[in-house]
């Protein structure tokens, strides 16, 4: 349940403090795209209750779960499904963008987490999302790109 209004040329999304859990299964077009599965997982940590996400397209697409749990999420993997218990109070820590989609997941989780998050292997994110730092800072995110010593 997220309040939204769809107009001819825009969508207005209103903030809420309560998000309902959902069940999602990735499918080929026109189903739910597997490429959105990992970013959605970060958002499911905000939902009150248990969300279930089933990956039917690719094996081994849950590398992001290790790092979300490290941030304080409560996610269990069972073969091709994950069970996301929420809401979680995510905390900043060091995580890894294991690929482009996991990187998007880590960015979304970091935006909600308390404290500072360091995302390693950021080249996956920068390669896949044009001007992502500028776009996110323009809406209030604090992001710093630095070289590791």
Describe each PLM feature range:
Residues 1-149:
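Short, structured segments at the rim of ligand-binding sites
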